[in-house]
């Protein structure tokens, strides 16, 4: 057995204990105090693993945690990207307590992505305790608002990515394949608002301007922008409008989700949505929102990075395959900044964002060993 894998297997129970502690420190994205409590604990843990932690203060979100480990044997840096905010609320751990069943640890945030943070922490601990030098200095960025769009962290993510030779993202992988992601779709979000004019639906219908009617035309037009052959989807997910059945609705609104494989498609859809014009005479159409995350692109450098990881995993005694998803992560930003990015390096798990979220316990030492060797070998 490879010495790094042997180390991880020997420390599997300690890894599990750390993960449980991280999960118990609940960290909803919008609760700065709770997120910062976990952040301070993580800073202490990474410092004990030989890394130098620095907090990047944020006013309305949790403070970002940057950790530096090295120096490496070569110039440059390798970036590891995590987030420690979750979609769950404080108190959810009482409703959905940690439990171990059939080799799985269930609990809020176990997979997304406190399991990935555990993997990263133990990768550094392993390098430190075995006296192994990473190929490049390791810079870990642990963010606090990934689940709500990363507005407070995007600039820092992109700046670090531009200085990095590779970006390794510890988001979870889905079992049993443990798929590493070489691509993700980009995302946009829009709100289409139609303003009409109210009137009595029975006595004076012609005096009104029906905002719901106008929006209905736009919804159908938006849905037709979807092109599955090239991976573009346009989804009208939430629609509101009107006040009472007997009142011509004066306002209506649609929230639109867009996914795309290329920036060319992002711009095509953006132009189409911003170009919406009223169909019902007298109505007004307003569009807010726009392009958020660029696509994480599968390219030659990304494929080479995956192939390196695949060979390391095989040498460690397990298999990983390659894939992608329509879901986005902060890896979209590192890829958009031009940094070769490999995602899905966290623990294997499923049920994300639900009370059935879990990680496969046996994947903790495997993924930590894989990440440690990727950092060691570059």
Region spans (language model):
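Acidic/His- and Gly-rich active-site-bordering loop/insert found
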Residues: 1-108, 129-134, 331
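Metal-dependent amide/peptide-bond hydrolase catalytic core
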Residues: 1-3, 27, 45-48, 57, ...
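Short glycine-aspartate micro-motif
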Residues: 77-79, 105, 165-169, 191, ...
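Acidic/histidine-rich catalytic neighborhood of metal-dependent amide-processing enzymes
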Residues: 113-183
């Amino acid at each position: 057995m490879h010495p790094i894998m042997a180390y991880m297997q020997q420390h599997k129970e300690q890894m599990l204990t750390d993960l449980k502690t991280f999960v118990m420190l609940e960290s909803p994205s919008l609760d700065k105090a709770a997120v910062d409590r976990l952040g301070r604990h993580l800073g202490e843990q990474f410092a004990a693993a030989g890394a130098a932690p620095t907090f990047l203060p944020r006013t309305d979100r949790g403070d970002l945690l940057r950790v530096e480990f090295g120096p490496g044997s070569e110039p440059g840096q390798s970036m590891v990207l995590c987030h420690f905010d979750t979609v769950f609320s404080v108190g959810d751990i009482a409703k959905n307590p940690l439990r171990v069943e059939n080799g799985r640890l269930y609990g809020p945030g176990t997979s997304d992505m406190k399991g990935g943070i555990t993997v990263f922490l133990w990768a550094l601990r392993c390098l430190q305790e075995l006296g192994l030098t990473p190929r490049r200095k390791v810079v870990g960025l642990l963010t606090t608002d990934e689940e709500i769009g990363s507005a407070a962290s995007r600039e820092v993510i992109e700046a670090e990515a531009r200085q990095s030779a590779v970006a390794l993202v510890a988001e979870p992988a889905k079992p049993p394949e443990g798929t590493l992601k070489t691509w993700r779709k980009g995302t946009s979000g829009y709100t289409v608002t139609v303003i009409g004019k109210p009137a009595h639906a029975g006595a004076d219908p012609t005096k009104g301007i029906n905002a719901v009617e106008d929006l209905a035309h736009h919804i159908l037009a938006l849905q037709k922008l979807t092109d599955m052959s090239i991976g573009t989807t346009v989804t009208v997910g939430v629609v509101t409008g009107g006040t009472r059945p007997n009142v011509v609705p004066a306002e209506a609104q649609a929230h639109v989700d867009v996914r795309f494989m290329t920036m060319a498609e992002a711009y095509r859809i953006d132009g189409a949505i911003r170009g919406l014009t009223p169909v019902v005479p007298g109505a007004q159409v307003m569009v807010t929102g726009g392009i958020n995350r660029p696509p994480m692109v599968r390219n030659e450098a990304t494929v080479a990075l995956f192939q390196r990881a695949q060979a390391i995993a095989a040498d460690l005694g397990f298999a990983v395959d390659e894939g992608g998803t329509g879901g986005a992560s902060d890896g979209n930003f590192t890829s958009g900044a031009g940094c070769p990015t490999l995602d899905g390096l966290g623990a294997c798990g499923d049920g994300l964002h639900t009370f059935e979220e879990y990680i496969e316990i046996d994947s903790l030492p495997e993924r930590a060993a894989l990440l440690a060797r990727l950092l060691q070998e570059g």
